[in-house]
C-alpha cells in the first residue's frame, strides 16, 4: 500500500468536494492510503477558530478522523512535509503550487486535483 501524505489544502478539498474518480484512484496507481500529518491537524484546528475557514476546517477535521495519522513535528505543515520528502521521498497531496514545485525539485511525487479528479502529476 502506498502512503500519500496530505497537506492542509488537499485535505480540505478532499473533504468538501465531490471527487469524481475517488473510487478508481486505487486501480490507477495501486492501492493508496491517505495519511494526515499531526502538523496538518494542528493547522486545521487553528483554522477552525477563524471566521473565514471555520466550517471547512471543522468538516475536514471530522473527515480526517477516518484517515491514518502520522507524527510530523514543526511549526508549519509545508516545512514539515518538505523535510519528510527530503529524508524519505514519497507522494505528497497538495494544491499549493509553490509546495508542488519544491517537492518535485527534491524528487518527490505530487498528487493533486484537476476538474475534481485526483491526478498524479509528473
Language-model regions: role of each:
Residues 39-122:
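Nuclease catalytic cores that cleave nucleic-acid phosphodiester bonds
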Residues 1-66:
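Domain-level signal for Mg2+-assisted phosphodiester chemistry and nucleotide/NA-binding surfaces
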